[in-house]
Amino acid sequence: MTEDIKEEEVKEEEATETTEEVVEETKEATETTEEVVEGTKEATETTEEVVEETKETSELEEAQARAEEFENKYLRVHAEMQNIQRRAKEERQQLQKYRSQDLAKAILPSLDNIERALAVEGLTDDVKKGLEMIQESLINGLKEEGIEEIAADGEFDHNFHMAIQTMPADDEHPADTIAQVFQKGYKLHDRILRPAMVVVYKEN
């Protein structure tokens, strides 16, 4: 009888110890679960922070892209405005530089007529002197406007001269030199108003 009681007491003690171990393990498991939950919560918060930072970074990059686009548009518009201003300035300069072109076209025929009149024989001294004064006045007026006679002696230059006739070249008159001026040529600064019409020596 006594042995049975002792055996039961031993079983009760073992059961109690087992229960305590189970409780302890349950407690540890609960703590582990809480740690996992806490870790998950922290990970979630970290993920939210990363997402927020990524969102802010994306918005910043988008804002920077828009700023660069606006800057590029401004630079293009600014460059275009500068080109327009430059072209307008060049056009004004060209107009100013060649403003006398129409004047020259109107005066040059009259100057040609005066030269032809002076070549006529039998002019009285007074008439000749009067024509020469008019001629000089016209030439000076043209010079003031930048209009000058093209030199037509020496070698023929197709940039300034127009050959309307040729003559045989010889020892005294080399080929491609000007023999005679049929009509004077004129230029306005660097622009040819009309080439000089000349007779040129050529090899046979």
Curated annotation (Swiss-Prot):
It comes from the Bacteria. GO terms for biological process: protein folding. Residues 52-65 have a biased composition (Basic and acidic residues). GO terms for cellular component: cytoplasm. Residues 1-23 have a biased composition (Acidic residues). The keyword Chaperone applies. It is found in: Cytoplasm. Residues 1-65 are annotated as: Disordered. Signal peptide: none annotated. Keywords: Chaperone, Cytoplasm, Stress response. Its main location: cytoplasm. One of its GO terms (molecular function) is adenyl-nucleotide exchange factor activity. Pfam families: GrpE. Transmembrane segments: none annotated. Participates actively in the response to hyperosmotic and heat shock by preventing the aggregation of stress-denatured proteins, in association with DnaK and GrpE. It is the nucleotide exchange factor for DnaK and may function as a thermosensor. Unfolded proteins bind initially to DnaJ; upon interaction with the DnaJ-bound protein, DnaK hydrolyzes its bound ATP, resulting in the formation of a stable complex. GrpE releases ADP from DnaK; ATP binding to DnaK triggers the release of the substrate protein, thus completing the reaction cycle. Homodimer. This is Protein GrpE. The lineage of its organism: Bacteria, Bacillati, Bacillota, Bacilli, Lactobacillales. The gene is grpE.
